Amino acid sequence: MGLKRFKPVTPGRRFMVISDFSDITKTEPEKSLLAPLKKTGGRNHHGRITVRHRGGGHKRRYRIIDFKRYDKAGIPAKVLAIEYDPNRSARIALLLYADGEKRYILAPKGIKVGDTLMSGSDAEIKPGNALPLEKIPVGTLVHNVEFTPGKGGQIARAAGTYCQIMAKEGDYALLRMPSGELRKVHIKCYATVGVVGNEDHKNEVHGKAGRVRWLGRRPHVRGVAMNPVDHPHGGGEGRGKGHHPTSPWGLPTKGYKTRRGKRPSDKFIVRRRNEV
């Protein structure tokens, strides 16, 4: 996968940097693995905005991804295609299992069409294979890591991300998260070996506001540009805030910790991401 730059023939093209999509081998998705996807516009079931700056964008269909893999333990799977997924930054790989079933997984870096992948405790340590953490050597880079055994991968699923197994002690493995946090995860949890593919995603530049709108993101309006009824920074003559910077709901911003204290999972965090 590479990046594509453009001649500045228009203002929107001048700084645009996008994927060249050379890693994509199949343009039409597998119909049996599609599901309808309704737009929410950032609203919850009460109709209230819970996530700002969402709405519009191109219509999408959801690709059903297998984040678990353990129920196919010991069954080899052949990579049929690498596909684009509009719902995530990573590419997805279409697998054909020896029992005839097709499934999508996150496409790890380095896999190609024709490769054979496996899952289960006896699988080889190579990119794309899924194993319990207890079977993966210390120092290995992994992605799609479970937090709870059997729940499916939740961590390190975005393009180019990974966790590193730092140590193992008793029933837990110590993992360095993509954020830098050191965290204990149960050794029965599954993880996929390797790094998530499409690692150049972070270097893409949209080039113009319209491309961001196609992705379903609306403008992010500054608080000082609003009226007093809309934001604590709003109103007044000129651009002054008048007080310490706050969120739209009045909480201090710029460094104020909002994480709820005394969470049950705190005992699994060995070092927070912002500690040196």
Curated annotation (Swiss-Prot):
Keywords: Ribonucleoprotein, Ribosomal protein, RNA-binding, rRNA-binding. The keyword Oxidoreductase does not apply. Belongs to the universal ribosomal protein uL2 family. PANTHER family: LARGE RIBOSOMAL SUBUNIT PROTEIN UL2M, RIBOSOMAL PROTEIN L2. GO terms for biological process: cytoplasmic translation. It comes from the Bacteria. Transmembrane segments: none annotated. PROSITE patterns: RIBOSOMAL_L2. This is Large ribosomal subunit protein uL2. SUPFAM superfamilies: Nucleic acid-binding proteins (SSF50249), Translation proteins SH3-like domain (SSF50104).
